[in-house]
Structure formats: C-alpha cells, structure tokens
C-alpha cells in the first residue's frame, strides 16, 4: 500500500487563506492524498508575536479555528493533522489534532514546550 502525504503552507490573511484552501482541496483530490499535514494553528494570523496576552485576539483565533473545522471535510477522505488554539478550563493550549471523516476531530497532543523569545511569545499567551 502506498501512502500519499500532502504537506502545505497556508497564508493567514483571510482572503489569501480562501485561495490557498481552494488550491489545497483541488490538489488533495487530484493526487488522492491519504494524509494532509497543515501548518501549526493555520486558520488565524499568528498571534504570539506580541508578548502581551490579548483575550480578544485569543478568542478570535479560537473562533476562526472552530469555524474552519467544518471545512476539513473538504479534504476527505484524507486524514488531516494540524494544531489549534483551544481552551481547557482556565488554561490555553496549542493542541495537536487528528481529523478524519469517520471519527471527526480528536485531540492528539497538548504542546508543552512553549518558547518565549522575540517573535514567538507562546508561553506568555
């Protein structure tokens, strides 16, 4: 059995993301990909460039990822792997997930090493 894997980059500007997504869907269908690896938290602009946590920015990122989850079905029957910002009670995580058409979204890993350095202030968030 041959496993076809698609690895991609997606721009985080909403209009460009729409265009990139259409291209990705066409590619996955044409190549009959079995597995699609998306970038880290792909459905919102990267927010951890600022050291200061902003609840509104975080909420917008979570909402954007939640909205895009329904569109993962566009890539079926491929399995999709990526990460998303998610709330666990009062804590915030960058959670790796696996999605497929049969079982839906499943959390796979909560990122525990969070850098805190210029341009990547994940631990501060």
Regions found by a protein language model. Give the residues of each.
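Active-site-proximal beta-strand elements of phosphoester/diester hydrolases
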Residues: 2-14, 95, 108-111
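N-terminal phosphate-binding loop and adjacent alpha-helix
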Residues: 8-26
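Short, flexible loop segments at the rims of nucleotide/cofactor-binding pockets, characterized by
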Residues: 11-16, 58-62, 120-123
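Intrinsically disordered, low-complexity acidic/polar segments
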Residues: 14-17, 37, 105, 118
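Conserved protein kinase catalytic core
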Residues: 15, 46, 114-116
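Tryptophan-centered motif/residue detector
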Residues: 18-22, 46, 121, 125
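Cys-nucleophile CN-hydrolase/nitrilase-fold catalytic domain and related Cys-dependent amidase chemistry
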Residues: 25-102
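Active-site catalytic loop in hydrolytic enzyme cores
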Residues: 87-125
